Amino acid sequence: IPGRTGRARAAVSVPPPAGEQVPTERLEPRVEERAGGYWVLKEKYRAGLNPQEKVKLEKEPMALFMEGGIQDLARVPMEQIDAAKLTKDDVDVRLKWLGLFHRRKHQYGRFMMRLKLPNGVTTSEQTRYLASVIEAYGADGCADVTTRQNWQIRGVTLPDVPAILDGLRAVGLTSLQSGMDNVRNPVGNPLAGVDPHEIVDTRPYTNLLSSYVTNNSQGNPTITNLPRKWNVCVIGSHDLYEHPHINDLAYMPAVKDGEFGFNLLVGGFISPKRWAEALPLDAWVAGDDVVPVCKAILEAYRDLGSRGNRQKTRMMWLIDELGMEVFRSEVEKRMPNGVLERAAPEDLVDKRWERRDYLGVHPQKQEGLSYVGLHVPVGRLQAADMFELARLADEYGTGELRLTVEQNIVLPNVSNERLDALLAEPLLQEQRLSPRPSMLLRGLVACTGNQFCGQAIIETKARALQVAREVEKRVAVPRPVRMHWTGCPNSCGQVQVADIGFMGCLTKDSDGKIVEAADIFVGGRVGSDSHLADVYRKSVPCKDLVPIVADLLVERFGAVPREREEDEE
């Protein structure tokens, strides 16, 4: 972590401007600490709660981890679990605090397990272990790279969970607090420490944040009863690979009075009913205070956030209700010394920077070494792929892999003398994990879709690949175009940040038949000129998408129609 390079400074806070009035009673914390360190909603605030809050009140979710409940639950047959509401809610809701998501609708009795992987950094040993877990489940087992630089593994059965958790601990991993109303995986620069142009190495900060959030994988019940999920990122590059504008808290590197630290953005999020870009908190913290300010913001959100309508419980709704200055004041009084400094005049991100493509071969800051970005088609991997990736990381690098928010993988620290041998490896030659994908495939992102997810309305991963490949037969695309797919309005595929986005829905076709369809979004941008996409067309049947997308690429993105053979349809 960069040291303090400036003079010693007294912490000074500027009083908030007058005019924003919030009733005193509204600022009373709505939660209180109970035995075991758990934070519970006060009795007088329990009217009008959403169903998820009622489940949390009925039984503390973290008890499944901190009090050994998972070991007992894993011994109970699913049929017996379903016979009682309490244990059924354990399986369908509370296990999400352990990163376990029951796929009741599509894979009854099987779970998706989401990990914590700060900055997307993983090792060959960890990758092999995860591969061994999904391999045991045969056709039901696979892994996905997520849009938060993370692993999700599929096919897990409940009786296996205690042993899997032990295996994760043995290789330095955890799945704790990775679902529901918790802090999600801390995102950082996927090229941290190897990027010749990085502003700061984000890994120390994301590791600190993750250690705080999970209490070093022991469980941190002080922040496990948030009103809703909460996303955080640390910016380390001019490219803004970390997507600060859609995070609840984004640390923007900035120098104030000669001292390195971060300006703060807050409130960015995507949801079914609303999506909003993060706004300046008008606050700066020194590099040493990354965790204290995160803690203060989380506690303000935990204490004051609404727990009624689930669609209005993300942190930005609280900021809107209180006003930014009052929200800032609530954060400030939860800081260790009761002071939160005003922002530096500007951050260190170059607003004229053209975002770089990390796929392919690129020189590192370390002489004689390169990193190789590999495209993972819609983020889906099988056990054999992961075993091979682990081997490549050991044989050509330093046993390390980096996951990206675009669902791809970076292999760092490859000696330049070994690049040709790496690029000749069958896994890369077969186009399975290509360093040189086509213009449309390289920017393709897709959520899980209805193959596994009960909330998804349409199938996404196979369809995303099919549409991209069919469109490429019709038009030549001169530059990468980021196309994102999400199976439902929850937008796990982040369609609002895409050049072209597809959000799953249902509609009637020309024959009056209900068919899978998509709302099309256009105009999302990432980088310093970030902008969330707007709806372009609603309820387009999926079978009609290819010509529409091809025309859109010609009209908006400089694509050129290809010549067709006479016998081509």
Curated annotation (Swiss-Prot):
It catalyses: 6 oxidized [2Fe-2S]-[ferredoxin] + NH4(+) + 2 H2O = nitrite + 6 reduced [2Fe-2S]-[ferredoxin] + 8 H(+). It comes from the Eukaryota. GO terms for biological process: nitrate assimilation. It is found in: Plastid, Chloroplast. Induction: By nitrate. The keyword Metal-binding applies. GO terms for cellular component: chloroplast. Residues 1-28 are annotated as: Disordered. Residues 1-4 form a transit peptide. Belongs to the nitrite and sulfite reductase 4Fe-4S domain family. NCBIfam families: PRK09566.1. Monomer. This is Ferredoxin--nitrite reductase, chloroplastic. It comes from Zea mays (Maize).
